[in-house]
Amino acid sequence: TLRPRVEHAQILDPADLPRFAALGVIASMQPTHATSDMPWAQARVGADRLRGAYAWRQLTASGAALAFGSDFPVERVEPLPGLYAAVTRQDAQGEPEGGWLPKERLGLAEALAGFT
């Protein structure tokens, strides 16, 4: 059985978010990329496009399946930094306070499901 997915589904058009569940497409991302990208993302892609950036909560709410990974060797291979990023949307120093685009944070069980 084929399981179609979009790899690096990091910055999506919000209109496309519900299409993942409707079409049975897995949204594959690396949570640590969100915290690596956050310092420059708005300047490079614009505030409007950030509405669909690392949209884990929106994708989950629509019924889409998420697949998480580390993208090693681009990021560290250990899963704990990715779990931390998915739950807090903060970097290793705890920045920004409250998390980047915090409405997209996941619970620990949801983040763990993405990695397993």
Report the location of each language-model feature.
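His/Asp/Glu-enriched, well-ordered alpha-helical/loop segment
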Residues: 1-4, 8, 14, 18, ...
